[in-house]
Amino acid sequence: MMRKFDSGPSVKSYNKLQNWFDFSKTGFIRVYSGKVDIGQHISSTLALIASKIVNINYEQVEIIRLDTDFTPNEGITASSLSVANSGSAIKAASITLKTNFINYALNQLNINEEDIQFENGVIKDKNSNKSISYWDYSETDHYKNTIIPEQFDEEVLKKVSYANNQKIELKNIKEIVTGKYKYVHDINFPNMLHARIVRPHLYNCELIKINEDFKKRLIENNIDLFVKGSFVAILSQDEFLAVKFSELAKNQIVWNENRKLSNDNVFNSLNANEKESLLVKPGGEAVNEKIPEIQSFEHEGIATLSSEFRKNYLMHGPIGPSASCAIYSNNKFTVYSHSQSNFALKQSISSYFNIDTSMVNIKFMPGSGCYGHNGADDVAFEASVLSKAYPDCHILLKWTRQDEHCWEPYGSASINKLFGAINDKGQIVYWSNEAFSDTYFSRPSNEELNNFTSFKFLNNDFTKIRSKPKTSAHMGIHRNLDPLYNFSKTRLVKNLVHDLPLRTSALRTLGAFANITSSESFLNDLAFAKNIDPFKIRINHLDDERAIEVLENLENTMKKSHAKPNNYRGIGFSRYKNSAAYCAVGVELNISDDLDIKLITAWITVDAGEIAYEDGIKAQVEGGFIQAASWTLYEEVLFDSKEIISKDWDSYKIIGFDNIPTFATNVIDRKGYPYLGVGEVVAGPTGGAISNALRDALGQRIKTMPFTKENITSELLN
């Protein structure tokens, strides 16, 4: 059977070679993409895809940073879709470029294909030494009018041979490790103003007054005070003074506290608060249908289990706080941002100022890297507001560490309630998983400008906005609630819980981390009930051969060694969104008498389709493992009725270098298959593997993350 290649959704909107390539720099191919570098080095992978197909050195390919004035709009850099969408588009454009260029050159040089020499973008006639290059070709109408097909058949693909698994140097890596790389925080323009926001201690505080003597002191020091509604900023050409006086201002302002945070235990609130419940169908779509009761079983030989798993609030915690630079000049905003969602940001800013979108240009400039909706959009919006008040002047606004920890939208706390039934043949005949959570979708938009945290302060409107449940397949709370496994009967329910205390939005994997961790833990508990091997119960409930191969590869790898005395092992598996890459994780850990958990070894097997860049895949899954391990073992946002307590790294614990395991990572190559997103695939399996290894160690399931001494002790005693 012929294997075809689909160009992906981006080509449907941008089907000209000119949408993807720029040949204005002699000797280099510059490639456009609508995806951005947020720590995953996607630009290196995209450059490699182009270079190996168009037959030019990797060093001669440059990825043009996103600019909303001219780069393709490929949506948010999220949901593990960068290589799947932008990578596929660039692959399609590269195939189209190469095949059309060869045909054009053969015609222009009047030679046969066996007579050409093709190196570094130049085709030469072996006999006459006449030549033509990509740069020559890019000037022709033939190039300018060429359309990228939406699909390629096998005959075309056979003509485009290329190698995989090349070793490359990441773009800009030398500058990054030597400190020469410029982030948005490092921007410096003549006469630029540095800004800091002065915030209250809590979300819903209205400005009452600012000390008049303090205002005079600001004037004496040539420092600007910007106030609109309850939005307060300090600005100075001297960054040190902006920082100093913004700190002093905190004690010079009187706020009215409109509403405290809920003092109740968040898990009590998740159970008790008003909620909207939707049934999740096989395939992952959520529908507004009657929720069936959990089925009862009284059949002989059927074992039933129920369990409840809990996850606390998590923060993004980027190593550098959010920042943005903006200027308003000639009736146009130019904003430098490290947001993942720059085209939506452009729309939102234009909507706030009631101007045409053409009057807002967002230029991506890297920050410290973050997966999800952190403070990047908020700070860009705030910088644009300040720039309007100071026309023709660049405003560089940096959040503080406390800003980032206390004002970013978190990943929601959640509960998963599971019930299952397994018969004597080891078949799971019934599976129920019910998820309870706040929203994972509160990105700002034209219609929801109040999702900018400062929009509320600018307008003194602290009305609590209720989110609406998302219904598309594997969206938000119910991402990966529908398992890949074949269970005889399933009951899957998402509950969007209202009036929870903290601001929440998209954090890496959305609800999938909690859903997969709880499912993989509960699956092991059902296996133990019938004394079934954890690998066997998973494989026996799968008919996807690629999923089975991933699990078998992990099993064979782990069998090459045995757990050392007092070490314990666990596994986890999923296919992210049931449509992205497949991933199986094994963990070996040790737990001390003091309940300190030490990660020893992590085995990871991943199938991401055709390998775009193997080292990049390994870096993504190993880095994703570390982040998920940190969530599982350490991280939780602490708060009380008055404030967020987790203001810094002392009060928000993360994994340290002393608990990074040894990695053994296998990437299965499926050359000719579609690229599958890999950025988020490892998180859920990691949580499941650690949970299962901990159960192996303790003989009891710990059901509240993070698995701290306090949570372990509490559950063991109860």
Please place each PLM-identified region on the residue numbering.
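Cofactor-binding beta-sheet edge motifs in enzyme active sites
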Residues: 1-718
